[in-house]
């Protein structure tokens, strides 16, 4: 029996790869209101998938996570000032193409969410937030940056996110892009073309 707070199966949100997961035979579950794959039985199940990631490579659909772009409004510096206000790590130290792990906190010091902050340009940042708190986080960011000269854009539904993990992750992805992945250091990223898709960002933040 479903509780009133549990979304009906038809109401579950879906990532752009949902149809592909189903065609490939994934076992789908309700993950925080999203219809997500928990395992692929044809691959041998959870233990086999775990071992594949530890010993080789695994690909995860994390498109349910949120993406918030913050850019300056009419004057330079507005985006940086806003990011400095809402996150704990010092974003002024980030070079363009660099990212860091950070946190958004309530005034009493408890967590709104943990985030990864990417510096896209001198006056542009991308915040990757967790799926379960996506709407809450976006509303909180909008509310707490009202006094800053910046533009807040929710890009969560505009992009598909894949996490490629394991010791062979670089080797796998290198076959799909002309970008030289060996030049991407930990917590750096670069724009690239992957599988012919030009509007792609490759980040080494795992």
Question: Where would I find each of the regions flagged by the language model?
Answer:
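Basic, glycine/lysine-rich polyanion-binding surfaces/domains
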Residues: 1-206
């Amino acid at each position: 029996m479903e509780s009133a707070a549990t979304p009906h199966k038809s109401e579950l949100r879906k990532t752009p790869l949902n149809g592909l997961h189903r065609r490939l035979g994934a076992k789908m579950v309700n993950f925080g209101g999203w219809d997500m794959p928990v395992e692929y039985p044809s691959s041998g199940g959870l233990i086999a998938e775990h071992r594949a990631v530890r010993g080789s490579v695994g690909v995860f659909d994390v498109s349910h996570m949120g993406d918030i772009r913050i850019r300056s409004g009419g004057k330079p510096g507005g985006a940086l000032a806003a990011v400095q206000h809402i996150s704990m790590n010092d974003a002024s130290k980030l070079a363009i193409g660099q990212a860091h792990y950070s946190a958004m906190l309530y005034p009493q010091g408890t967590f709104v969410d943990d985030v990864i902050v990417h510096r896209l340009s001198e006056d542009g940042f991308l915040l990757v937030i967790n799926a379960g708190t996506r709407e809450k986080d976006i509303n909180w960011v909008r509310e707490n940056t009202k006094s800053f000269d910046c533009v807040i854009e929710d890009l969560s539904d505009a992009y598909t996110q894949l996490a490629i993990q394991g010791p062979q992750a670089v080797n796998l992805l290198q076959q799909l892009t002309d970008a030289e992945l060996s030049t991407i250091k930990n917590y750096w990223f670069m724009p690239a073309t992957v599988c012919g898709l030009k509007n792609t960002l490759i980040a080494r933040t795992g």
